[in-house]
Every structure is written in C-alpha cells, then in structure tokens.
Amino acid sequence: MAFESLTEKLQNVFKNLRSKGRLTEADVKTALKEVKMALLEADVSFKVVKQFIKSVQEQAVGQDVMNGLNPGQMVIKIVNDELVKLMGSETTEIALRPASEVTIIMMAGLQGAGKTTTTAKIAGKLKAKGRKHLLAACDVYRPAAIKQLQVNGEKQGVEVFAMGDKNRPVDIAKAALVHAKTNGFNVLILDTAGRLHIDEEMMQELQDIKAAVPVDQTLLVVDAMTGQDAVNVSEMFNNKVGIDGVVLTKLDGDTRGGAALSIRAVSGKPILYVGMGEKLSDLEQFYPDRMASRILGMGDVMSLIEKAQANIDEEKAKAMEQKMKKAQFDFNDYLDSMEQMRNMGGISSILNMLPGVGAKMKGQDLESMVDEKDMARKEAIVLSMTPKERENPDLINPSRKQRIAKGAGVDIAEVNRFIKQFEQSRKMMKQMTGMVGKGGKRGGFKLPF
C-alpha cells in the first residue's frame, strides 16, 4: 500500500519528540532532517520537500506545548496542516454545466496508466449524480481500445459512441457531440489515444480536439507507480495542452506515493480522483485532508463510512442484524457479508482506514492477521454446500461434510473446524444479545471470517 514506509518513518519521528517538554531549534532540525529523508525516499519532488520543510520549521521552532498537546502531537498538527496545504487544501470536483447543456470532458494520458478504465469509472461516478453520459471512443490507434471502452462502458451502464478506427479522432469527437445533443446526453467524455511516451503528434491531436469541440475539462490520468515521472508528465501536459485536473491511478499498489504529494505543487493542478483498485468504488474522490490523515497513520474514517454507505445494502444489513439476534445467521448471510467486505476493498483495506491500526501494523502484520487465502478457502467450503445446507447448517452430517470438502478442495478437518467455529459464533451472538437485553456489558466474539 502507498505511503506505508513513509507513515512508519514519520511515526518514529513523532515518537522521539513526545518526551520533550519544549521544542528547541535543535530538536526541530533533527526531526525535520528525518522527515526530509522520509519524504525524499517516498519519491516526493526535491523542490517540494525543500519548501515543505521550510514551512514546517518556521512554525515549529520555539513553540510551547499549548492546550494540553505534547510536542509530538503539536508537530503532527503542523505537519498535517502543511501536507493538506501541499495537496491542495480543498477537494476539487469536476465542474459540470447545467443539466440542460452538454459538459465535455477530455481524458488524456500515457498508455498503461489506466485511462480507458478510469474514463468509464468517472462516467459511472457522475451517472450516480443523475447525469446522462456518453463515452466517445477517440483512440483509433491502440488495438482493441474501442472494444475495451465498450466493455467498461457496459459495466457502468453508459452508452459508448464509436465510429471504428478509420476516422480521425477530431471527426469522432465532433460527431459524438452532435449525437449527444440529439439524444439528450448532458455529459460527453472523450477517451483519447495514449502513447508510450509524450510526442508532438500526440499533443497536436489533443490541441486539435480542443479546437474542434468546446472542451470544458481536460483530465490527465497518470500512474502513481511511475513516481516522479507522473509529476513530470503532469507538468508537460499542462504546459502543452492545458489540463484542469489529475486522476492518480494504482495508488493501492507497491508505490512510494510521492506523486500524490508533488503533483499539485509542481503542476498547479488539483488531483480529483485516486484509483485504489479495480472496482468502481475503488475510484475515490481525492480529499487532501483525508489523505494527510492516512499518511500520518491516523486513518480515514469518513472515507470508510462513505464506502460502507455505497456498498452495503441497508435493508439486507437490518435483516442480517435481526437474524444474528435470533441466532439464525446462516451461510447465505456469511456469503453476503463476504461480498460486502470485498466491495469495500477487503479487510486489510478497512483496517488501514481505522485510526491507529495502519500506523501500528505494517503490511506484513496485516497480512498475517488477515489471511485472505484462508477466507477464500472458507468461501469455497460454503459455495460447495447445497442451497438447503446453507439455509440450515444443522443438515450438514459427516457424509455431507465429505462431499463439501471434496468440492472445495480442502480436507474434512478444515470443514469441521469452520463449521464448529460458525456454530460457536451463532451461539455467542445469541448470548451477547441476551446480555445486552438484560443491561449487561457486550462481550467479545470472533466471527468465522
């Protein structure tokens, strides 16, 4: 996960400062030297780091501990405020025209950044706001680019306008605008061609499209895995074509994350979205304050709540709660809970958003705590059951267990352990409900996840 190493190093810096009653200039300089190295190792631009350290030092030197905050907490606040300022302070959204007019968004970027997939995801995000979208396939060079956009558009329930690969991108863009106006679409998103590297032909094509149709927003998609190259690409696109915002993809991968901290400062353009995975819900609105909180290991509860609201069916959740109270939670409910957890990015993603958890546990610790392979085996066990067995776990006798184990590709001992754990959880749910009903304290129990 991005920023994992940076978060750990910053936490160590703050830990060393917590025992001091007053921050001397020497204390601050020593701490900021470590912060500087941590940021540089995270692939943050040198110029950006230099200015950042200067701003923090000016505020931190000689400050007394105020309002009950210890020095470590005070430095965290100063660093947090500067990180937020560095990434843009305020959240920037795509500016849309009134619904009676057509908003034209042009997507640009290099090949491999995830531009076409991101284009469809943005359409899906804006569709949820009640807009009628049209995607236009303007990439006539890359093999299967048009088909890829059509497949992704279908996933989001968004129409794709295509004229094949024999027409000029400019002509496709103009025809798409006519189609949008004629058929009542109020958002047109142009998926333009990517290149392996920036060249004059590519830039000229984008300029020609902007000259031919009234583009309202030009969004650049860059790959966070490329580090400082992503920052350089943003600066070059802005200078040559003019961009209004950036979408930073693959921030969930094994990347140092420095691009997220550098792009705004270097290009002057805001990050609108960050890609944290493959699903639509993994394209997250970029909130500078929440990202700063994640970097400092303080979690991101607001984003977690929003993910839950977007992915959890409220009616199903209420029905499941009632079944848990009556100890009627069955294997179908187990599958539903697994699906909801997956839609939220998995247990590791959820834990990383909880305050303190991501800071105290490295990625390897989370992996040992949450065995995704073990969860997959348990899900395979449930999927090997018949519908009646899932509804009524009491039906599962030894011969049925043999069949289930064979179907799931596990040994019968694992099936026995899982079913026993499941039954214990159901009993604990019932006991806990009774305790709470009598005014007792809630007890802890482990779900078979």
Predicted segments, located by residue:
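Primarily NTPase-proximal linker/entry elements flanking Walker-type ATP/GTP-binding cores
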Residues: 6-138, 145-165, 173-192
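Short, surface-exposed connector motifs at secondary-structure boundaries
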Residues: 129-134, 156-160, 188, 213-218, ...
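Short, glycine/polar-rich helix-capping loops at beta-to-alpha or helix-loop-helix junctions
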Residues: 143-149, 230-233
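Conserved phosphate-handling catalytic cores of large alpha/beta enzymes
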Residues: 173-176, 181, 185, 197, ...
